[in-house]
Amino acid sequence: MSFIEMTGTTLEKIVADDELHHDDLAAAGVNDHTIVRVNRQGDIEVRRPSGWDVIGGLLGEFDERIRRETGLDWAE
C-alpha cells in the first residue's frame, strides 16, 4: 500500500474544514511532532510505539493537497 508520511504540523495544514479538527487530532494523540501517514484512500494513521492506528480520514481532492504541502510522492 502507498503512503505519504508527515508530521502533525503538516497534517494540520492539509486537513480541510469538513474533515478532522484540531481537537480531534489532539484527542487522537497527534501533536506537532507526531509521525503520521496517509494512504491513497485518505486514511490517516498515527505512529504508535508498536505500530500504526487509523484515526480518521481525508475527503475529496486530498492527493494534490498532500503532495503540494509535503513535497513528497506516494511510496510503498
Annotated model-derived regions:
Residues 17-67:
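Acidic, low-complexity, intrinsically disordered interaction modules
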